[in-house]
A protein has these predicted regions:
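Short, hinge-like loop/turn segments at secondary-structure boundaries
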Residues: 30-31, 59-60, 150-153
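Short, surface-exposed acidic/glycine-rich loop or hinge patches that mediate macromolecular interfaces
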Residues: 16-19, 46, 50, 140
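N-terminal ligand-binding/catalytic initiation module
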Residues: 1-40
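Conserved strand-to-helix beginnings and helix N-cap segments that scaffold or border functional pockets
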Residues: 25-26, 53-54, 146, 164
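Glycine-rich phosphate/diphosphate-binding loop of Rossmann-like nucleotide-binding domains
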Residues: 1-2, 18, 83-172
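Anion-binding alpha/beta catalytic cores of soluble intermediary-metabolism enzymes, centered on
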Residues: 42-107, 121
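A short acidic, often aromatic-flanked loop/helix-cap motif at beta-alpha or helix-coil junctions
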Residues: 19-22, 76-77, 141
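Redox-cofactor binding/interface segments in oxidoreductases and associated redox assembly factors
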Residues: 40-43, 154, 175
Length: 175
């Protein structure tokens, strides 16, 4: 909220106790969907266990889905259409593009297959004509896969998983 205000954006934070009923959350989302003064909705994950995360995500209008988690936005991103993009992969992508504007033909290794980071990052790099290999913490010879990458993005929630000797000279690494 503070960061939004600092850059001139209006932001309202709606907090609920962990005991909140799913219906209460869904009703608020439906209300915000109808409100033309609301341009975006972001639901802080994880949700309490008794609330169906997918139901909540799907209740948000795709046009107001700040995180890019709605199935329509996920599908649009993977099909190359305009969509909301999750902020972490988008930030990584913009950083990579600042370092190397021409990604055409680069070999990218994504360590992580989550819907939040790994899969969207893969789609963004595929759109740039990278050859993308998706790996994860259980990949056999992860070091060998990483050594092939011109770009390595580690997004598995394990700090410093990618070691220095896993990276070839001049590779771009985001961990």
């Amino acid at each position: 909220e503070k960061s939004a205000n600092e850059v001139g954006l209006k932001s309202d934070v709606i907090r609920y106790p962990d005991s909140v009923e799913e219906k209460t959350v869904l009703d608020k989302i439906y209300e915000l969907n109808k409100d033309n003064s609301v341009s975006g909705i972001l639901v802080q994950l994880p949700l309490p266990k008794h609330i169906d995360k997918q139901k909540v995500i799907e209740a948000i209008l795709p046009s107001k889905d700040v995180d890019g988690f709605h199935p329509m936005n996920v599908g649009n991103l993977s099909s190359g259409y305009e969509s909301s993009i999750p902020c972490t992969p988008l930030g990584c992508y913009l950083l990579i593009k600042k370092i190397e504007p021409n990604l055409n033909g680069k070999k990218a290794v994504i360590v992580g297959r989550s819907n939040l980071n790994g899969k969207p990052m893969t789609q963004l790099l595929l759109k740039e004509n990278c050859t993308v290999t998706i790996t994860h913490s259980k990949t056999k010879d992860l070091k060998g896969e990483c050594l092939k990458g011109d770009i390595i993005v580690a997004a598995v929630g394990i700090p410093e998983l990618v070691k220095g000797d896993w990276v070839k000279k001049d590779a771009i690494v985001i961990d």
